[in-house]
């Protein structure tokens, strides 16, 4: 087990699913989970890590069901984007209560609620030690929050996209359904495609691959896992270009 005293990454993009904020509830935001996540992000800031955050909106709104019932997909996606803003507001508030400087930037202008997304300003804020939360996805329908995470990660020149999920990495099969599923420690982009492993949607994954953006999948519900990932300890599954030997 590595005991590297220095963080492996300097600037990260943390992607959290909206569902991660629910805790054991079936809907909404569990305040205890929110506060724990804010404390874990605070630990990173205290280590000198520059942190960008993208949060999904699935705990507050799911457009698929309404789309099947006849709602226009664009309308549903706009509602989903607003759900991510609500989660972003909650996270910003939790960080402020933990005495962490944080700014919320939305891809959709919401005057008086949060800042408009501005790439140059986001970089400046990160460099000054502020956590920047990116809300409203990419601002476009038909784009997932995973796509937004990869896009923002590439834009801010993050060294890695950390995808916090409910399982502790990428498995050969669904570990919830198959007890014999094998966990991978490291995979290449091509292995993910060959094995048809579900990490994120293809558009997001292809964007990360084309820009050589590593993705690290880990369990955000596991206390201390985020810090262990940052410190380069054996946690989660790292996906990157295959190293030339």
Swiss-Prot record:
Subcellular location per the Swiss-Prot or TrEMBL entry: Cytoplasm
Domain of life of the source: Bacteria
GO molecular function, a single term: UMP kinase activity
Reactions the enzyme catalyzes: UMP + ATP = UDP + ADP
EC number, UniProt record: 2.7.4.22
Entry binding sites for UMP: 57, 77, 138-145
GO cellular component, one term: cytosol
Stored Pfam families: AA_kinase
Ranges where the record places region Involved in allosteric activation by GTP: 23-28
Record keywords: Allosteric enzyme, ATP-binding, Cytoplasm, Kinase, Nucleotide-binding, Pyrimidine biosynthesis, Transferase
Main enzyme class: transferase
InterPro entries: AceGlu_kinase-like_sf, Asp/Glu/Uridylate_kinase, Uridylate_kinase, Uridylate_kinase_bac
Record entry for activity regulation: Allosterically activated by GTP. Inhibited by UTP.
A GO BP entry: UDP biosynthetic process
Binding site for ATP: 15-18, 58, 62, 165, 171, 174
Annotated metabolic or biological route of this protein: Pyrimidine metabolism; CTP biosynthesis via de novo pathway; UDP from UMP (UMPK route): step 1/1
Subunit structure: Homohexamer.
Entry's family note: Belongs to the UMP kinase family.
Function: Catalyzes the reversible phosphorylation of UMP to UDP.
Protein's recorded name: Uridylate kinase
